[in-house]
Amino acid sequence: MESGFTSKDAYLSHFNPQDYLEKYYNFGAKHSAEDQILRHLLKILFKIFCLDGVKGDLLIDIGSGPTIYQLLSACESFKEIIATDYTDQNLQELEKWLKKEPGAFDWSPVVTYVCELEGNRVKGTEKEEKLRRAVKRVLKCDVTQSWPLGAVPLPPADCLLSTLCLHAACPDLPTYRTALGNLRSLLKPGGFLVLVDALKSSYYMIGEQRFSSLCLGQEAVEAAVREAGYTIEHFEVISQSYSSTMANNEGLFSLVGRKLSPCV
């Protein structure tokens, strides 16, 4: 791939969703840093969506990638979910799981873990079907555009969720701030913003392919979120980092904010 920050075209050409899933989401297969991080993220998302009152009618997941782990607790608190991504291959991988097609990634170990977190109220198969029913649409998304979902008519969302996306989509802080502002147009006043992303990372690996990452610190993230028109209700740092062969991050963070209402 070209030098410099990984371009959008490079993602279309070089991002392999099957390799990504196998490297980062092969849950329970080994006691790896990736396994521990996924456990942390599932616990955080369970707390946000099942304990902390982040709920509503519509959640839009920005940059879903080929993954569904981030939606397993969210589907308990939102009636409808829209999944989005920039790359066609990730959208196809999502559709494969939603439609139970042959070769779809096996999320059942992750689903079982989330069911345990939620008190085993339902079996894993029931949880999977609930999420499939909740995901109403899978759409193309580009956070660098003023209208990230294009001209698709949608009601304003009660919550925007974005996990491990913006650090890879934004080459610099001005673009990051602009992306947060662009996303704001999708959210109703008072609606929730939930971000999970890597801290102090400049790259991540999928096999031999190296992808750029925007080096984000807590202060920079908080400043960008506020400048884009959100309040911050909660910020948590996860000290666990990925394996040194996978990425060079220094932990991750989760943030819950809300879109400021317009001044009267």
Curated annotation (Swiss-Prot):
GN (gene name): NNMT
Specify whether Methyltransferase is a keyword of the entry: yes
For biological process, the GO terms are:
methylation; nicotinamide metabolic process; positive regulation of gluconeogenesis; positive regulation of protein deacetylation
Species this chain originates from: Sus scrofa (Pig)
What modifications follow translation? Deiminated by PADI1 and PADI2.
Positions of S-adenosyl-L-methionine binding: Y20, Y25, G63, Y69, D85, N90, D142, V143, T163
Pathway as given in its UniProt record: Cofactor metabolism; Amino-acid degradation
What top-tier enzyme class does this entry carry?
transferase
**SUPFAM superfamilies to which the protein is assigned, alphabetical:** S-adenosyl-L-methionine-dependent methyltransferases (SSF53335)
Q: What is its EC number?
A: 2.1.1.1
Check the record and name the InterPro entries matching this protein.
Answer: NNMT/PNMT/TEMT_CS (IPR025820), NNMT_TEMT_trans (IPR000940), SAM-dep_methyltransferase (IPR053384), SAM-dependent_MTases_sf (IPR029063)
Q: Where in the cell is it found?
A: Cytoplasm
* Assembly information from the UniProt record: Monomer.
Q: Which NCBIfam families match?
A: GntF_guanitoxin
Question: Which family does the similarity line name?
Answer: Belongs to the class I-like SAM-binding methyltransferase superfamily. NNMT/PNMT/TEMT family.
Residues annotated for nicotinamide binding in this entry: D197, S213
Q: What is this protein called?
A: Nicotinamide N-methyltransferase
